[in-house]
């Protein structure tokens, strides 16, 4: 069984036992978190699809928090002797999917 969940403004296709990185969540490592905004559920019988499936949820365990590799940004204006360098490291939360519960379409 798999599901498509929404967190941090992004959609993720997940299955039980998978580990993935999502936008930073304010939950301590080792705690469980429940995602209620599920857009799709699928298994061998077919799929359930909707804006938000009523009663559907995905539970996950927070494994760790971290920061991604640095992305370097350079802004350059030709012939003006102007160059601006900047870097960015995005915070993330690593989660492990522990369960997927089905539901009815709203």
Swiss-Prot record:
It comes from the Bacteria. One of its GO terms (biological process) is translation. Keywords: Ribonucleoprotein, Ribosomal protein, RNA-binding, rRNA-binding. Pfam families: Ribosomal_L21p (PF00829). Signal peptide: none annotated. Coiled coil: none annotated. InterPro entries: bL21-like, bL21-like_sf, Ribosomal_bL21, Ribosomal_bL21_CS. The keyword rRNA-binding applies. GO terms for molecular function: rRNA binding; structural constituent of ribosome. The keyword Iron does not apply. GO terms for cellular component: cytoplasm; ribonucleoprotein complex; ribosome. Belongs to the bacterial ribosomal protein bL21 family. Part of the 50S ribosomal subunit. Contacts protein L20. This protein binds to 23S rRNA in the presence of protein L20. NCBIfam families: L21. This is Large ribosomal subunit protein bL21. It comes from Xanthomonas euvesicatoria pv. vesicatoria (strain 85-10). The lineage of its organism: Bacteria, Pseudomonadati, Pseudomonadota, Gammaproteobacteria, Lysobacterales. The gene is rplU.
């Amino acid at each position: 069984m798999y599901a498509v969940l929404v967190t941090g403004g992004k959609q993720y296709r997940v299955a039980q036992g998978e580990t993935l990185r999502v936008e930073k969540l304010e939950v301590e490592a080792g705690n469980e978190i429940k995602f209620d905004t599920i857009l799709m559920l699928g298994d061998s019988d077919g799929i359930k699809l909707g804006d938000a499936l009523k009663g559907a949820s995905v539970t996950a365990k927070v494994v760790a928090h971290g920061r991604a590799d640095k992305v370097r940004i350079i802004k350059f204006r030709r012939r003006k002797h102007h160059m601006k360098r900047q870097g960015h490291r995005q915070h993330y939360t690593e989660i492990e999917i522990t369960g997927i519960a089905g539901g009815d379409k709203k």
